[in-house]
Curated annotation (Swiss-Prot):
Transmembrane segments: none annotated. This is APC membrane recruitment protein 2. Residues 101-111, 272-282, 295-307 have a biased composition (Low complexity). GO terms for biological process: ectoderm development; negative regulation of canonical Wnt signaling pathway; regulation of canonical Wnt signaling pathway; Wnt signaling pathway. It comes from Gallus gallus (Chicken). One of its GO terms (cellular component) is plasma membrane. InterPro entries: AMER (IPR019003). Its main location: membrane. It is found in: Cell membrane. Residues 1-308, 342-596 are annotated as: Disordered. It is a peripheral membrane protein. Negative regulator of the canonical Wnt signaling pathway involved in neuroectodermal patterning. Acts by specifically binding phosphatidylinositol 4,5-bisphosphate (PtdIns(4,5)P2), translocating to the cell membrane and interacting with key regulators of the canonical Wnt signaling pathway, such as components of the beta-catenin destruction complex. GO terms for molecular function: beta-catenin binding; phosphatidylinositol-4,5-bisphosphate binding.
Length: 624
């Protein structure tokens, strides 16, 4: 630890250590101020510091003022105090010399060493006055000093910025002397385990708290130093322990990767130096100046924890250090967490994507069949798996609904032909077209078979519709409240006839051509049967039900055309009944999918043909 003290002291005196201290103090000060422990430390420091209280007050003003002169003066006074100290004077004076050079070199380093010196001065002076008594108190303060010096380093970082520079220098200077003195005091404490150990415990507790407040690196290093320092100080002879402890602390500081490592080393030195009660007191007071110092200074002196408490406090210190490390990691973790949040944001982005996917799924659910067939965009928006699953489930639901509607619509003779045509045409469009045609004249009979066939055809379309959904990119433009049901027919048509929007264009453009191909509704039904090209066939069938009007309207929207022709047709009432059934069922589904529901409702309100309604219902069920 001697090497540590020596090494640590020069670094403390050196600017780099001061810089490190600065960083550490910034971090430490925040934590210290944030922590509940500062008040405890302050109380202990105030009570235990008694003798060093006056010096502490001066140190506070100096540190608070952030005057390098005050730091130098405190260093000189500490040196004088070191001279007063028995054998500690030499190390503390040497430290003072180092501190003086450091203070001259860097104000920040000066503040750091001044803190160390301040810690050392009371130690030296008090050691001269009452070596053993203060040894107990010093050990309190010594442990306190270790932690408080750690605190000083933390505050010194702040003080370096503001006023800590003056106090840092003495602490760095005092390190060796304070270590020796603190070790001596600890040994002296051994006779006075109760008072000294409690003080040490108080120091340990304070230091641990301070360490918690301090940078994680400093805290982690200091805790081992505080725990090891206390144990080592009390266990090892004063001459050996200060060096060994300093080396160990130095090693710990070296181990610390943080820029505060030098600070930690200096803080450790200061902490070791701070083993002497005086050392601890001034640092605590500067902390009070920072707002942490006041709490830290009174606590160690005022509260004399039993020796057992010192052990417990050491444990607490380590726990605190661990927590501080976690906090620092949290700071890093804060970043990491922020990154995670960003990732979460990204994940939420992913989630959002999935949510849009879900929303899109909602849309696909709205149009799962329609979307897959109608708009590849929607299908693209919705996960393929979801679409497939929903499509299959909805197809099953649709098949049941269609069967129910078919049972209501009744009649399957003409529909028997339709199943073939629907199967050939993939049934849904043929079924819907036939339904429209049948509603024109075959409404109920084809509806039953058409529903079954539509279910079959749609089931086929589910499989085919998904690949067709790629074509749905063109369809993505088509989706509209009115176009939804038509799109569902067209969806089916697209999967059947073509994989591209061309089929839809054909549906819009070619439907006029198709109607001549299937003038009779039955012929139209046969057309879908014979013709796999559903867009044209479907359009023809849709047109056929309302023959003339649909032909003109088809280009506008098959759904509307189908619905208008159906409404115009005598089967409008049937379509309305079917539509109402579909509406009830689809509305059940609509509850889940407002858009699809709205579209379906619009279709039903417009009196879309039973086929259109069924198509919408199937689409809605598929969507749902």
């Amino acid at each position: 630890m001697d090497s540590h003290c020596d090494c640590a002291e020069p670094p403390a005196a050196e600017q780099p250590s001061g810089k490190i201290n600065k960083t550490a103090f910034k971090l430490f000060k925040r934590r210290k101020s944030g922590g509940t422990m500062p008040s405890i430390f302050g109380v202990r420091s105030k009570g235990g510091e008694g003798k060093g209280a006056s010096k502490t007050g001066m140190v506070r003003s100096r540190t608070h003022d952030g005057l390098a002169d005050a730091v130098l003066e405190s260093g000189k006074k500490e040196d004088a105090g070191g001279g007063e100290a028995q054998g500690k004077d030499a190390p503390s004076r040497a430290a003072g010399g180092l501190g003086g050079s450091a203070s001259s070199s860097v104000a920040k380093s000066h503040s750091f060493f001044s803190l160390l010196r301040k810690n050392g001065r009371p130690e030296n002076g008090k050691a001269a006055e009452n070596a053993e008594q203060r040894a107990g108190g010093r050990q309190k303060k010594g442990l306190k000093g270790i932690f408080s010096s750690m605190r000083w380093h933390r505050k010194d970082k702040i003080g370096k910025e503001e006023r800590g520079e003056a106090s840092e220098i003495p602490s760095g200077l005092i390190m060796p002397g304070s270590l020796t003195a603190s070790l001596e005091c600890i040994k002296e404490e051994t006779p006075k385990p109760l008072s000294e150990t409690p003080n040490g415990a108080g120091d340990t507790g304070v230091e641990s708290q301070q360490e918690k407040r301090g940078g994680d690196a400093c805290v982690s290093a200091e805790e081992p130093q505080a725990g090891g320092g206390e144990s080592r100080d009390s266990k090892t002879p004063p001459g050996e322990d200060p060096a060994a402890a300093a080396r160990r602390l130095e090693e710990l500081c070296g181990e610390r990767p943080d820029p505060g490592a030098g600070e930690v080393g200096t803080a450790k030195d200061a902490a070791i130096t701070g083993d002497i009660p005086i050392t601890t007191i001034p640092p605590v007071e500067p902390h009070c100046d920072s707002g942490q110092e006041t709490a830290a200074a009174p606590d160690p002196s005022s509260v004399d924890p039993p020796s057992e408490q010192s052990i417990d406090r050491i444990c607490l210190m380590f726990a605190d250090v661990t927590s501080l490390k976690s906090f620092d990691s949290l700071t890093g973790c804060g970043d990491i967490i922020a990154d995670q949040e960003e990732d979460v944001g990204g994940g939420s982005g992913g989630c959002e994507k999935s949510t849009p996917g879900a929303g899109k799924l909602g849309a696909p659910k709205k149009h799962p069949t329609m979307v897959a067939y109608q708009g590849g965009g929607e299908e693209m928006a919705s996960p393929d798996q979801v679409d497939d699953t929903y499509l299959q489930e909805f197809w099953d639901m649709l098949s049941q609904t269609e069967e129910t509607e078919t049972g209501g619509g009744g009649g399957g003779g003409g529909g028997t032909k339709t199943p073939e045509g629907l199967k050939e045409n993939r049934g849904t469009e043929g079924a819907q077209n036939r339904v429209a045609v049948k509603r024109g004249g075959l409404n109920q009979i084809p509806i039953h078979l058409n529903n079954k066939e539509e279910q079959k055809g749609r089931e086929k379309e589910q499989h085919e519709g998904v690949p067709n959904s790629d074509e749905g990119y063109w369809d993505s433009t088509t989706p509209g409240p009115e176009e939804d049901s038509t799109t569902s027919i067209q969806k089916e048509t697209l999967p059947r006839d073509s994989y591209s929007g061309d089929a839809l264009y054909d549906l819009y453009a070619e439907p006029d051509e198709n109607p001549p191909g299937g003038p009779p509704e039955e012929e139209v039904t046969c057309m879908p049967r014979s013709k796999p090209v559903s867009p044209i066939t479907t359009t023809c069938s849709l047109k056929t039900p309302s023959s003339t009007v649909k032909d003109s309207k088809i280009p506008i929207s098959i759904k509307h055309l189908a619905s208008h022709p159906a409404s115009h047709g005598t089967d409008t009432s049937n379509s309305h009944h079917v539509a109402h059934h579909h509406l009830a069922k689809s509305e059940m589904h609509r509850t889940k999918i407002p858009v699809s529901k709205v579209l379906v409702r619009r279709v039903s309100n417009r009196g879309l043909a039973g086929t259109t309604v069924k198509a919408a219902t199937h689409q809605d069920s598929a969507k749902k």
